[in-house]
Amino acid sequence: FLGAIAQALTSLLGKL
């Protein structure tokens, strides 16, 4: 579950 959150955060950071 936490892995999914970390992956989502990484995706958002990548869009910046």
UniProtKB/Swiss-Prot annotation:
Keywords: Amidation, Amphibian defense peptide, Antibiotic, Antimicrobial, Cytolysis, Fungicide, Hemolysis, Secreted. Expressed by the skin glands. The keyword Secreted applies. Antimicrobial peptide active against Gram-positive bacterium S.epidermidis ATCC 12228 (MIC=8 uM) and against yeast C.parapsilosis ATCC 22019 (MIC=64 uM) but not against Gram-negative bacterium E.coli ATCC 25922. Has hemolytic and cytotoxic activity. It is found in: Secreted. This is Temporin-1ITa. Belongs to the frog skin active peptide (FSAP) family. Temporin subfamily. It comes from Rana italica (Italian stream frog). The modification Leucine amide is found at residue 16. The keyword Ribonucleoprotein does not apply. GO terms for biological process: defense response to bacterium; defense response to fungus; killing of cells of another organism. GO terms for cellular component: extracellular region. It comes from the Eukaryota.
